[in-house]
Amino acid sequence: MSDIWDDEEVRETPSEITRVKRDHSQAGYLAGVTKAKDESLQEGFNAGYPIGGQLGLSIGRIFGYLQGKGLVEEEKQARKELSSTRIFDRQYWTTDAAPTYEGVHPLVKQWENKIDVMKRE
């Protein structure tokens, strides 16, 4: 057993050097991928937050009106038609998660129009 304070030169074998290089390369790759994913997620969040917030607010107003008026069947229908599955259907969004429509989401617009009619009756 050698003393840790010995002046003996530590020699690494080629396999140890290869392993260390591989480990450092993998760690660098993983750090790069993680950073890129984090940046991409943040950009997506920043872009989608205002759209999602507006959708939630609009849909909440629709549900609130129907509940407030005691329109149980209409509310059930609205919840079905304005479900997240339908709101986020592929026909309304590009592969980059941008809306394919301009202005108000078409399903929300339909319900806003229905409520406008109800208010006039």
Swiss-Prot record:
Keywords: Cytoplasm, Nucleus. PANTHER family: PROTEIN YAE1 HOMOLOG. Signal peptide: none annotated. Residues 28-68 are annotated as: deca-GX3 motif. Belongs to the YAE1 family. It is found in: Cytoplasm; Nucleus. This is Protein YAE1. GO terms for cellular component: cytoplasm; nucleus. InterPro entries: Essential_protein_Yae1_N (IPR019191), Yae1-like (IPR038881). The complex LTO1:YAE1 may function as a target specific adapter that probably recruits apo-RPLI1 to the cytosolic iron-sulfur protein assembly (CIA) complex machinery. May be required for biogenesis of the large ribosomal subunit and initiation of translation. GO terms for biological process: protein maturation. Its main location: cytoplasm. May form a complex with LTO1.
